[in-house]
């Protein structure tokens, strides 16, 4: 879905629609706009896709490496998707696969030294883009929004009724 489609959906949410629907559409349009910008900049400046960046970010957090199944679980994608991404990054010598000593059918994937250096540059740029894209909100507004979204993420509702 393009940012334009998200904006159009938000516009179609009339004032008489429930506030929750309008909020959901606003969250969707903001998230899509930010993600589209980051995808474009990663592609233009580093010739890398967002899923490849995400996989490298997972590996940066775990220097000893991760199994393919753990990468799949953390990224919430299929094993086939992870295999394809790892294949691409391995060709570019940004990651390496090592057979697991305990299970010769499984591999541990880790960043190479070149991968660590490349990811460090990408992560620095990514952080700057996020700061820029969230810049219209003051720091205290970002803190408030973070707290509100944390409540939403936890699933707790001030308005939910206890049922017995």
Can you annotate each of these PLM segments?
Residues 16-19, 48, 111, 137:
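Alpha-helical hairpin
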Residues 143-164:
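Exposed, interaction-prone assembly regions rather than primary DNA-binding/catalytic cores
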Residues 26, 37, 54-57, 117, ...:
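Pre-recognition alpha-helix immediately N-terminal to the DNA-recognition helix
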Residues 2-12, 87-147:
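Charged, amphipathic alpha-helical coiled-coil/dimerization segments
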Residues 34, 38-41, 75, 118, ...:
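Alpha-helical linker/hinge and terminal dimerization helices associated
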Residues 1-46, 164:
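N-terminal leader segment of winged-helix/HTH proteins
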């Amino acid at each position: 879905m393009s940012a334009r489609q998200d904006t159009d959906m938000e516009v179609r949410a009339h004032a008489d629609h429930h506030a929750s629907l309008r909020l959901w559409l606003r969250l969707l349009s903001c998230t899509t706009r930010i993600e589209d910008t980051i995808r474009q900049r990663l592609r233009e400046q580093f010739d890398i896709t967002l899923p490849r960046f995400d996989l490298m970010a997972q590996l940066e957090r775990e220097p000893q490496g991760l199994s393919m199944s753990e990468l799949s679980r953390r990224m919430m994608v299929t094993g086939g998707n992870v295999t394809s991404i790892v294949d691409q990054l391995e060709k570019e010598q940004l990651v390496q696969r090592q057979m697991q000593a305990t299970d010769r059918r499984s591999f541990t994937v880790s960043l190479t030294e070149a991968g660590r250096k490349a990811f460090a540059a990408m992560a620095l740029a990514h952080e700057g883009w996020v700061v820029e894209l969230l810049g219209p909100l003051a720091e205290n507004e970002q803190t408030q929004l973070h707290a509100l979204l944390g409540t939403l993420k936890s699933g707790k509702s001030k308005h939910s009724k206890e049922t017995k």
